[in-house]
């Protein structure tokens, strides 16, 4: 048997190991907890518990410490964090760290749990007032090396490079890198003993260390290479020419201070020494309690399954045999027909199997299948390659033969399949004449339904969160950028473990996620009855695509270009000079320096902003911002739609094929890309022109059906307000009825302006709009807007009562729900920052309505597609979904019966206390049908 035919044991954990045979005493490991705290917070997705407690930093920091325990068995390990309050550096320099923003609330909430876990792990935890964690680490490192003990400092802080010596090494577990003396020279171009002077020269904006103005790393290194140290640089400062020389001489008085601030102390007067810092026995009971509280599921399983759960020494705090990331896996590359037959037989007998395709492209219309992978049991998976065609590629089974053999299995609806984003696999297999059926589970959707905002829902992120594993990344085997290989070009010995791991991880993720869905029946119902049945519906819509008129778009694009040229000319005349309308820097100079317009808002760097909300405010009083806004709007339409849509017409079908995304938005709404249909303007003339380019094929019409005021109807249902319910039951114009109530006039006497104001109030309150926001929209004062809101709630008290109750529920539970039980978690609902809390409250009010609307349109899509597939396959096909609208291609002879059936099924998608009205239009293009 060749090496290729042998099972491959895939090891996915990269370890940093020191040669323990060269030293009798293991190194002391000093962990810079504060450094990892911030890095984990910013690097990892914003994970949360079911009660909305953030856990991203907890997971990140504890993962790093656990990895260090594995990599340095037997070593004394000490974890150091910064103390609250000022340090001696603030006494030296009052402005030290003065400009650093406060710690985010959702990070501050994670510090105590991290401290508790470190202590439960039996590790010494140090927090020393008056100094920083760096100084404590520097002092302990100095003590250890003076006793002949080597030191490993685990940190992500570049300042620590000054501690490196022949006996002190830095490691960064986030990047799996180590830095000894040679590493410092390689990274910085100078030795460890020069790092402090380097830091003094370049300064630190975050810590507010002055440094030398405009002196970057290259300049500092050049000076240090020439003159060795800061004192010599100061002595030779007159030899530095140009502006940078002036800056250096200006900084001479403050450079000693900068050096003092940058120097890590190695002589802190600690009340303890290394001898006093004892490792204790890990408290598994306490640790298990903490892991459960913060829902760290993979670690819970490790502790519960450990043979030594009652008595575990600090020296073997992490046992590889119980760590899912380090268990041996059997991944097989199948290149033998007999072995394939064996796997297919097993798959046919399995109640559920994980399935994945490897392809040549992420674009489903262009992708060819290179191989397929399967998993039935955790830790065992197979990859069947048949399309690797690089030079020297080993012999593989024939693609057509394999796919024909798999076709009955893959098309059997009774054979349950599990995958990660199976919609993509279904689309790709369709390119090869296979119609995937039996989609029983999808881990991407399981994760999304459990918590739409808690994590990214890609497999790599989910593996880290739920399994505690780092998967093999595509970039690690294919490379990056322009030179990245497609999967058919990747060496089979690398491609095999990667592909097999995909199936294995998917299976194990399902085993972790499905039980959580089962715990909450309503979430399980959302998954099983709404999101999962939608997968084949969206797949068929994507494959069908939509026809567009390239000539219509080209003509529109030319008109946009002409109008943009006119706007540019008008803007230049208004400004009194030519400038680039797309340059924020030039706009700042024109607006604020030349024209003296008021500064509404500044950028994070302190420059006057030219962002769209600022221009909208300025446009009320000034012509130039209005011209810029219109130019930007047309430029975006041109680049995003009129120029781009013709390029997206697929050569094989003559249609455009969008991609719908089920696991992106927080509320459950679908999003789309290539093209993004959701961003086509709804009410503007330019948006109408783009919709005119979506056309019906010969013999067909386009039918567009959408829900009338669905979110307001949902508000009436959820709030139970008698006034709103009555207005909808009577079929009244809800905006006219609201205007009559708010302005105290008869319905027949409502003016156009009053109706427009009432419409703004109706929709504004749904989105939690404040009096200030409503006033800006209606162009009235804040007091007047508040009066409108007060009158609205006087007339519709049930709405106010509902909003108050939903705010309270959000604060109590940390989430809100749609009518069908979909949850939206609100991590900032109890934030100390009032602005964040108020924003979360506005989301809490709107999310149940927007999310329920999303659930209803999804239910309608499944119902309509089932009806069309069963009764009208030749008469109509659903091709697009945008917001609350469905677009169908309908045979001209079947328009009336399809319209009747479509409106009936869409109206029946939900049972509300008010009628759910659907309006369907018909035309030769989308605009006519809209």
Predicted segments, located by residue:
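Extended two-metal-dependent nuclease catalytic cores across DNA- and RNA-processing enzymes
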Residues: 21-24, 47-48, 98-270, 464-466
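Conserved RNase H-like, two-metal-ion catalytic cores of nucleic-acid enzymes
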Residues: 22, 26-29, 33-78, 94-106, ...
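Acidic beta-strand-to-loop metal/phosphate-binding motif
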Residues: 78-82, 127-129, 152-156, 354, ...
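Short alpha-helix plus adjacent loop in nuclease-associated cores
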Residues: 95-109, 113, 161-190, 245, ...
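Conserved catalytic palm subdomain of right-hand nucleotidyl-transferase polymerases, strongest
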Residues: 151, 355, 441-443, 697-709
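Conserved "right-hand" nucleotidyltransferase catalytic core of DNA-directed polymerases
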Residues: 251-392, 411, 454, 462, ...
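Conserved catalytic core of nucleic-acid polymerases
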Residues: 485-488, 536, 540-543, 598, ...
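C-terminal polymerase-core module
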Residues: 562-569, 573-626, 794-842, 846, ...
């Amino acid at each position: 048997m060749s090496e290729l035919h042998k099972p491959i044991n895939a090891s996915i954990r990269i370890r940093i190991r020191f040669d323990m045979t060269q030293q009798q005493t293991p190194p002391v490991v000093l962990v810079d907890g504060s450094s990892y705290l911030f890095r984990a917070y910013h690097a990892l997705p914003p994970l949360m518990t079911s009660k909305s407690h953030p856990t991203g930093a907890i997971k990140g920091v504890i993962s790093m410490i656990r990895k260090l325990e594995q990599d340095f068995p037997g070593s004394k390990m000490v974890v150091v964090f910064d103390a609250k309050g000022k340090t001696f550096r603030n006494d030296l320099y009052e402005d030290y760290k003065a400009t650093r923003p406060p710690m985010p609330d959702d990070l501050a909430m994670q510090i105590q749990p991290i401290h508790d876990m470190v202590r439960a792990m039996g590790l010494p935890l140090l927090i020393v007032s008056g100094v920083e964690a760096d100084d404590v680490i520097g002092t302990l490192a100095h003590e250890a090396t003076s006793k002949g003990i080597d030191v490993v400092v685990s940190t992500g802080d570049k300042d620590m490079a000054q501690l490196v010596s022949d006996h002190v090494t830095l490691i960064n577990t986030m990047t799996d890198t180590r830095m000894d003396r040679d590493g410092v020279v390689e990274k910085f171009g100078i030795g460890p003993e020069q790092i402090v002077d380097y830091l003094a020269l370049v300064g630190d904006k975050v810590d507010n260390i002055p440094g030398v103005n405009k002196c970057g790393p290259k300049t500092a290194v050049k000076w240090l290479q020439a003159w060795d140290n800061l004192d010599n640089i100061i002595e030779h400062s007159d030899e530095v020419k140009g502006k940078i020389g002036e800056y250096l001489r200006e900084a001479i008085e403050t450079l000693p201070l900068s050096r003092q601030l940058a120097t890590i102390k190695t002589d802190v007067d600690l009340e303890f020494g290394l001898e006093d810092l004892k490792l204790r026995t890990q408290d598994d009971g306490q640790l298990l309690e903490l892991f459960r509280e913060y829902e760290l599921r993979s670690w819970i399983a490790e502790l519960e399954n450990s043979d030594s759960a009652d008595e575990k020494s600090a020296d073997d705090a992490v046992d590889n045999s119980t760590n899912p990331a380090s268990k041996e896996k059997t991944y097989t590359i199948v290149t033998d027909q007999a072995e394939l037959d064996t796997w297919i037989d097993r798959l046919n007998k399995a109640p559920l199997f994980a399935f994945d395709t490897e392809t040549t492209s992420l674009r489903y219309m262009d992708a060819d299948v290179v191989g397929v992978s399967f998993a039935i049991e955790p830790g065992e998976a197979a990859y069947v390659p048949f399309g690797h065609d690089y030079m020297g590629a080993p012999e593989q089974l024939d693609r057509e033969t394999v796919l024909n053999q798999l076709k009955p299995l893959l098309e059997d609806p009774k054979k349950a399949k599990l995958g990660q984003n199976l919609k993509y696999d279904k689309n790709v297999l369709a390119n090869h004449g296979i119609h995937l059926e039996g989609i029983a589970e999808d881990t991407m959707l399981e994760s999304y339904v459990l918590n739409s905002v808690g994590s990214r829902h890609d497999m790599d992120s989910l593996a880290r969160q739920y399994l505690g594993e780092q998967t093999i990344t595509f970039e690690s085997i294919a490379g990056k950028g322009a030179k990245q290989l497609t999967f058919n070009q990747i060496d089979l010995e690398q491609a095999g473990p990667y592909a097999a791991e995909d199936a294995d991880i998917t299976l194990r993720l399902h085993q972790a996620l499905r039980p959580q869905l089962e715990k909450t029946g309503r979430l399980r119902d959302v998954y099983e009855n709404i999101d999962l049945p939608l997968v084949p519906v969206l797949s068929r819509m994507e494959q069908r695509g939509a026809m567009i008129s390239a000539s219509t778009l080209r003509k529109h694009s030319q008109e946009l270009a002409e109008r943009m040229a006119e706007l540019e000319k008008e803007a230049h005349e208004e400004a009194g000079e030519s400038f680039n309308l797309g340059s924020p820097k030039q706009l700042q100079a024109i607006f604020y320096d030349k024209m003296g317009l008021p500064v509404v808002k500044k950028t994070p760097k302190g420059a006057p902003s030219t962002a769209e909300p600022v221009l909208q405010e300025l446009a009320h009083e000034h012509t130039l911002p209005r011209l810029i806004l219109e130019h930007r709007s047309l430029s975006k339409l041109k680049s995003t739609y009129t120029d781009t849509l013709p390029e997206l017409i697929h050569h094989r079908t003559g249609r455009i094929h969008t991609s719908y995304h089920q696991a992106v938005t927080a509320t459950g709404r679908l999003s789309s890309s290539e093209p993004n249909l959701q961003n086509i303007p709804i009410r503007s003339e330019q948006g109408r022109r783009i919709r005119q380019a979506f056309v019906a094929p010969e013999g067909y019409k386009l039918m567009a059906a959408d829900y009338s005021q669905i979110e307001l109807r949902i508000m009436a249902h959820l709030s139970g307000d008698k006034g709103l319910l009555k207005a909808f039951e009577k079929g009244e114009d809800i905006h006219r009825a609201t205007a009559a109530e708010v302005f105290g006039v008869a319905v027949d006497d409502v003016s156009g302006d009053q109706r427009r104001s009432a419409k703004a109030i109706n929709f504004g309150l749904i989105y939690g709009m404040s009096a200030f926001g409503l006033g800006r929209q209606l162009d009235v004062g804040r007091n007047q807007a508040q009066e409108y809101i007060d009158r609205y709630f006087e007339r519709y008290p049930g709405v106010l009562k509902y909003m108050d109750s939903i705010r309270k529920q959000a604060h109590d539970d940390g989430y809100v729900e749609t009518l069908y039980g979909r949850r939206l978690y609100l991590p900032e609902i109890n934030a100390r920052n009032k602005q964040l809390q108020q924003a979360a409250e506005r989301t809490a009010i709107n999310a149940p309505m927007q999310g329920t609307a999303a659930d209803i349109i999804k239910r309608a899509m499944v119902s309509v597609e089932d009806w069309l597939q069963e009764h009208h396959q030749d008469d109509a096909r659903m091709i697009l979904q945008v917001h609350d609208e469905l677009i169908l291609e309908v045979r001209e002879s079947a328009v009336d019966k399809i319209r009747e059936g479509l409106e009936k099924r869409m109206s029946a998608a939900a049972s509300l206390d008010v009628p759910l009205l659907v309006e369907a239009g018909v035309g030769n293009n989308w605009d006519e049908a809209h």
